[in-house]
Amino acid sequence: MKALKVVIAVIIVVVSIGLVVFIGASMYAVTTINLLSNSVYYAQRMPHKEGTEPDLVMLIENMGEIYTPKIEGIRYDDDGANFIENSIDSSGHPTSFGEFDGGYHYSDKNDVSYKFDKNFELEWALDKDYKKIDLTTIDETKIKGEIRETLKPILDVQSKPLINLQWLFNMKYQDRFN
């Protein structure tokens, strides 16, 4: 009888531990998926230093997890370095924004290329003939506005999460964008 009680106690302990591990792993998975798939929504609402653009960064970094609707004129590429191309406007010259060399790259309608670092600060710019452009002649705010306009159709369709983990997202990313 005593052996049966020990066996039952061991079974209860093992099942309890298994249940706790399963619940913990499930909560971790749900939380991780939530933070990634809603990262643009959270980034749009996170306090951040002016000029850092966390929503644009999250859009590119988590492109495989966020909602990327089929929109005529928008092309997504995530088979290496993520980038988004927008050929919606009537100029005939597409714009693109993507990951590049530890930072981000933007190519405008005039084939001017801009390289931003991981904190979204402009590092260099090249004209269509690949000649360096003096950064003091560039309106960085205007360029960031163009990038935002390029990505606007995707930014606008990011929905509110069912479980709002804004506080956790802020804990994880706020130092990066301040």
Protein language model features and the residues they cover:
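N-terminal hydrophobic targeting signals that begin at the initiator methionine
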Residues: 1-2
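Hydrophobic membrane-insertion alpha-helices, especially the h-region
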Residues: 5-28
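Intrinsic-disorder/low-complexity peptide segments enriched for small residues
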Residues: 17, 34, 54-57, 133, ...
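N-terminal export/targeting and maturation segments
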Residues: 20-107
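Extracytoplasmic electrostatic interaction patches
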Residues: 73-178
